[in-house]
Swiss-Prot record:
Function: Catalyzes the 2-thiolation of uridine at the wobble position (U34) of tRNA, leading to the formation of s(2)U34.
Taxonomic placement: Bacteria, Pseudomonadati, Spirochaetota, Spirochaetia, Spirochaetales
Name assigned to this protein: tRNA-specific 2-thiouridylase MnmA
Positions of region (Interaction with tRNA): 145-147
GO biological process: tRNA modification
Top-level lineage group: Bacteria
Record field: catalytic activity: S-sulfanyl-L-cysteinyl-[protein] + uridine(34) in tRNA + AH2 + ATP = 2-thiouridine(34) in tRNA + L-cysteinyl-[protein] + A + AMP + diphosphate + H(+)
List of residues binding ATP: L6, L7, S8, G9, G10, V11, D12, S13, L33, G123
Site (Interaction with tRNA): H124, Q334
EC number(s) on file: 2.8.1.13
Cystine bridges: C100-C195
Record InterPro entries: MnmA-like, MnmA-like_C, MnmA-like_central, MnmA-like_central_sf, Rossmann-like_a/b/a_fold, tRNA_2-thiouridylase_MnmA
């Protein structure tokens, strides 16, 4: 069996490689996908992928596995970055990691390697189960690290080629294995944030593409201007950190795109703005539309928290969702991901908040 392993330079993908080697497979090749954007890097003054590559090389040397670097900068810009920028301009909250997986890691990469490999292995925390020749996406054993949210838009064809060795492990176990075999990157910290940014600050990326535009920060209850911001695209509804005003905590509760105004409120008043009913479209089902929507739960952001909910099908591409509890951070552009027990069924894009 021929196996391709995607290495990022981090501990997770390195242990995924180790687990495959431990199963006795020998026909293995590793790949590092280069998606850094040269213009941004020269603007910000970093070369963050060099450290990744150093670790990739060190890990491959340890296991005597060949590796190759594949450049997907153009594909990433066209298929993920443009989407992200447009969502921000429209005042929405983008989810680029969902499309990074669907369109690049398991899209452009699959097209590039074509039929060369029987299996593609990554360090994602998720599980794939096969039943009656269908592939089902399941949450990882480690619910804190579970990445099914970001994998929710994969197709049957993509899933048929994938193997996630870390789906049955806790992160603590992964760290223990890394130390026990003395991995070169055993002490490397986990990466945070969007897949293509790495050490680049998200706001620097936004500033590069959309610039800055001064606007007022207004207290919702009083209408009083209490600060100045650099552009509505730097803020998301529900945001608490980064507002940089005294007498906090403050929360972003509304954005006026035309007037470039950010409305904020203190915690007690802000929670009154919590919502529970909204519409989603651009729906993707991993195994086709379910026969019923009973006992569904959804995530509206990456993390452990799921909501019980009621779903009402309006059309095949429009669903009304009613949460059992209100949430104070629902924003257009986010993705609502559907679950039944531990199975991830797919997801859809939030486009209108009702109440």
């Amino acid at each position: 069996m021929k196996i391709a392993v995607l290495l990022s330079g981090g501990v997770d993908s390195s242990i995924a490689l180790y687990k495959v080697i431990n199963k006795g497979y020998t026909n293995i090749k590793c790949y590092y996908l280069k998606i850094w954007l040269e213009d941004e890097l020269s603007y910000i003054g970093n070369c963050p992928w060099q450290e990744d590559l150093n670790y990739v090389e060190a890990v491959c040397n340890k296991f005597n596995i060949p590796y190759e670097i594949i450049n997907f900068q153009k594909e990433y810009y066209n298929k993920v970055v443009i989407y992200t920028i447009e969502e921000l301009k429209n005042g929405n909250t983008p989810s680029p990691d969902i499309f990074c997986n669907q369109r690049i890691k398991f899209g452009a990469f699959f097209e590039k390697i074509n039929e060369q490999y029987d299996l593609v292995v990554t360090g994602h925390y998720a599980r794939i189960q096969i039943k009656e020749k269908k592939f089902f996406l399941k949450q990882a054993k480690d619910k804190i690290k579970d990445q099914s949210y970001f994998l929710s838009h994969l197709s049957q064809e993509q899933m048929s080629k994938l193997y996630f060795p870390l789906g049955t492990l806790f992160k603590s176990e992964v760290r223990q294995i890394a130390k026990s075999i003395n991995l070169p990157n055993k002490d490397r910290k986990d990466s945070q944030g969007i897949c293509f940014l790495g050490k680049i600050k998200y706001n620097e990326f936004i500033k590069y593409h959309l610039g800055e535009k001064k606007g007022n920060i207004v207290e919702k209850e009083t209408g009083k201007i209490i600060g100045i911001h650099n552009g509505y695209w730097f803020f998301t509804v529900g945001q608490r950190r980064g507002i940089k005003l005294s007498n906090g905590p403050w929360f972003v509760i509304e954005k006026d795109l035309e007037k470039n105004i950010i409305y904020i409120s203190h915690n007690e008043n802000y929670l009154k703005q919590a919502k529970r009913k909204f519409l989603v479209h651009e729906i993707h089902w991993i195994n086709g539309m379910p026969s019923d929507f009973e006992n569904f739960k959804i995530k509206i952001r990456h993390g452990e928290k799921k909501y019980s909910c009621k779903l009402r099908l309006i059309t095949n591409n429009l669903i009304e969702i009613f949460l059992n509890k209100k949430d104070h951070g629902i924003s257009p552009g986010q993705f609502a991901i559907f679950y039944k027990n531990t199975e991830c069924l797919g997801g859809a894009k939030i486009f209108k908040i009702i109440e």
